Amino acid sequence: YSKQLNDTDHVNLPKNSSKFQLKSYDDAIQYLRIQTFQRNNMTTNASMVFYDSIKNALRAPNFIIDLRNNEGGARKEARKYFSLLKKYSKKGRLYILLNNQSLSQAEIFTLQLKQLKNVTTVGQTTKGMLSYGSNYGRREQLPSGIFEIYLTDMKGKASLLQYEDYGISPDISLNDQSDWIEQVVGIIKKKKGKQ
């Protein structure tokens, strides 16, 4: 048996997509892609330049934050985006787009955003890798010399354990039959029509 996949992958971002992007769909909807919170020379600099370019550009009443395939990273890197989106959420609606490749710091970031008003998560359940992990890749050989273990060096909060291995379920699930951003735009327009 082989699972039949669609010709077009609507769930994941294309491999060659930029890590950071801001664009407007129309006057009512803006889109923000953050594909990493990693802190290394290349991504930290790119993230800071990108952040500086967008920090005064969030104007639409609806905002899609695309965290699909976000590989996680450092809390310090996510903090600036959280502050920006927290301020924005007081006047606009946030739609957080997630998939099974949204993990680690992206999941923690999502839980923080969910505490704000006007936030809806959409997509699919996240990876469930937010309490344990290794930033430094330290291995320890056991006394027998036969086995080696890979230790966690992260201090996860007990409140995050409920999501470990299970992930964060979205408020609204999306199907894999059509473009996910277009599905979110449809949700926004439908909600706008009810107001």
Where are these regions (language model features)?
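C-terminal "exit" segments of structured domains
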Residues: 134-158
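Pocket-edge structural micro-motifs
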Residues: 33-34, 98, 123, 144, ...
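Short, intrinsically disordered/low-complexity patches at protein termini
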Residues: 88-89, 144-146, 174, 186-188
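A short, polar/proline- and glycine-enriched secondary-structure boundary/capping micro-motif
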Residues: 42-44, 160-163
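Generic "edge-of-domain/loop-turn" microfeature
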Residues: 39, 72, 103, 147, ...
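Cleft-lining beta-strand/loop regions that shape enzyme active-site pockets
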Residues: 1-141
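Low-complexity, Gly/Ser/Thr/Pro-rich intrinsically disordered linker/tail segments
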Residues: 161-195
